[in-house]
Amino acid sequence: MGGKGGRWLAAAVIAVLLLGAVAAVLAANKAGSGQKQVAPTPEQTVQPPEPLPLTGWVILVDPGHGGYDGGARARVSGTWEKHINLAVALEVEKSLAARGASVVMTRREDEDLCETERPASLTKKRQDMENRVAIAVANRADMVLSIHMNEYRDARQSGPQVFYRQGADAGRLLAGCLQETLIAELTPARARQAMAGDYFILQLEVPSALVECGFLSNAAEERLLLTPAYQAKVGAAIAEGAAAYAELRPKGAASP
């Protein structure tokens, strides 16, 4: 009797322990069911950066004159135009590159583009201009920007002036964009309009513009044009005008 009662007691203890374990599991499951389920974090899609406004454009920047050809001469300082053209053109190059363009320069120092030997019928000036055009053609330029300074007998004349080839619709649009940004950024006393001009560099079959950045015959404007900060401002304005054109007329959209 005692042995049998001991076995029953042991069985009862085991049953109680099992029931307790089951109850604990059920309680834990119930508590867990009340917790908010966290969804797995989806993988984030990395968006590619927006292309720069002049990405894919090859732009020829031509600092006018150079070497034997000094261009106009500033009335007060006597500085030759060729030096200021180069300083501004290098700023144009920097600003164009910052906007994604591939820039080709016709010169980076004080030099002309004449050869030592040339046909007798070919003047130094003509050969210089032809070689500038040849650089644009060889590099398949999509746009040409020729940088110059103006000069006039009336010292009161001032302000930037942009020229394009007569009959070149794309060139006229480019010149208009350049003129607008130059006026907006430089706020000249006289707001000029882009004009048609007969310049050799504008005869290319791509959008081309010749930018007269200001008048070296105007003392106040001469002082500005000799200042590196103003040269950088002019360069940035020209690059912004080129970008404005590219937005209106994407590369290859129309002939000049």
What are these regions (language model features)?
Residues M1-P256:
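Catalytic-site microenvironment of enzymes
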